[in-house]
Amino acid sequence: MRLSNFAELLVKRPKTVLLVFTIITFMVGSQVANLYMVSDMGVYLPKNEPTVQLLDRIEQEWSLGSTIIIYVEGSDVLDLDVLKDIDKVTQLIDPYRHDEGKLDGVITSTSIVTLIKQENSLPYPFGTGKYELPGSEYQIKRYVAELGNARKTLLTDDLTATAITFVLRNDIDADKILAKAEDAISNVHTKMTLIGTLPMNAAIKERSIRNMAIIFPLAVLFTAIVIMFFHRDLKGLLIVFLPPIYSIILTFGFLGVFAPELTMISIAIVALLIGLGVDYSIHLMNRFTEESSNNIASRVEKILRTTGKAVLLSTATTMIGFSSLMISAMPPMINFGLGCTVGILFSFISTVVMVPPLLAILKFEKKEKVYRWKRLAGFAIDNSERILLFGCIIAVLSLMVLPQVGTDVNYYELAPKDEMVIEKTMEFSERFGMSGNLDIILVEGDLKDPEVLKAIDDMEEKMRDIGISAYSVVDGIKRINLGRIPERSLLLDNIYPILIKQGMAFVDEKYSKTLISLNVPSGLSIDEYTALVQRINEIIDSTNIPDGHIYHVTGATAINVAINNILFEQQIRSLFISLLFVFAALIIIFRSSLYALLTMIPIGFVLVWEPGILVTLDISLSVITIVIASIIVGTGIDYGIHITQRLREELRYGLKKREAVKKAIEKTGLSLVEAALTTVAGLLAVYFVNVPALQSFVKVIIAMILLSLVGAVFILPAFYRLKMVK
């Protein structure tokens, strides 16, 4: 179909066009029901990463899943009534202690009560020989004292807090076990709170879905304020808002079919599409008001042929910038890149299909005064060299602080600060000095060989020397055998059945594999965690298991360190690809490598300024902020494209270079500023979800979008005035 015929169709049958497009949009949008939210940090690592592969193997062989920790508080948690409540809750959640989770989904449960029961089960005179909670307060305190340092992972020194830890199977119904746990703690008088990976993940999932519902109306509100400031016209508001709303519905409907897994960063897609989609509508609407023809079809054809082309170029380059995230080794980045890429395409389609019919139906004819933009254009032209020099100085200063840019993977930064589960988990971490996350070591060897057990015990002692709490079957054996490892295998044949009956032995049926659980200190920096994981692995490497093998540590801490190790490499990789592809696209679009290179100069400046922004705002690269550079390449290039496209258009009309540059800034100035501010307004909504990682993301990306605008308006003219530009 020729462009003139397409333009005529849009304005001659506007209601029909809008009706058909609405039907298609809601048919696609119906697939949004397939979307689901994940909050596990492990999804940020590629499946072939050794830490993930080992954890997957352990989870499959041992059916290991998430953990639930019940945080117990009281004036004296060793009070018999409190201990009875702990015992009651434990039995309600884990009624079948010996089933390995096959019936109740709980592989093992550990609390101060289970340790007291173990001590009490020892033969006289060390215990009563019965696996039960003693009724004597004296006996309870004696058993706790005999536990030594082992009690510190479950009991605070002031006896005002303790914990019950449940390790769950990986095939458990999360909602069902959480409901069961909530019901259990509600039936006792002692204050108890659910924390741990499963409650945290559930809280973050639920909150993330609510946040998406919050962001949308806020983004609309903030963007509407900007639009009303510029246009003061409800018609204009309707014209610029409907297309991005349709594009959001189309995007999430598409994701519901092809990539239904959402993560925390997916929340930003809504704000990005509102901001960028509104930009496209603004460009077409403002150009429409410039045309003076009485024939609306010819005016629409003109804006589609000129500004429409610039919007198409912006769409293509923005899609390229976002699609560079799809070559990431991190699955959530791939899905985020796909969502943004498809969303921008739908934004362009929605804008082209809907804006002309809306202009026709609403008879929009508002004229904009541009005298202020004439003065702005004059300032940009007259001071371009000074502005360029200032930009270069800032760039040099930014590069000087590049070594100060850090990387960080902090799960709590992805969690809303006002969520009770998160607050209690952080409080628990501070009081017990550990994160509560599961870190494990897989050991293969003959577990009935005392030498193997001694090697494991020696390794655990080295772990404890560096502040790591470790527990394995060896600790259970020593507790039953009066603090010693048996010298003969025959004694082990009698001890293992007792441990298995108590649910305290992570060993396989052949006694050839076992797991060591670790509790690492909380509150460390990512660099300290990296050094700690490295030290743990050094201890593992130095441990010799007779005819066996010990694998490196895996679990929450090891995964966070592994993610942190690939963050910088992933950003450089996606950034290089986006710059290369955008440059290639601009060469094809402009049919000139010179114009392509010049158009990218503002983005080059902004990317060089990024380290300075990160250091100034005290923000590290994370699984959220890592995508910013690629987003800026895709979005920030738009401003340069519109100026370049308008400059070439004015040159074709016969204007001299200086006047053409001035005219380009003058005519596109309003649209560019309005587009930048609407994008900022849309993104600003994300700041109100009270998630630190997303707030950092918003601060950096807003700063870089505004600087992209400044670069296009004030720095680009200096290069277009060069003699080589014709």
Region spans (language model):
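Membrane-embedded transmembrane helical bundles of large multi-pass transporters/channels
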Residues: 1-43, 129-130, 145, 149, ...
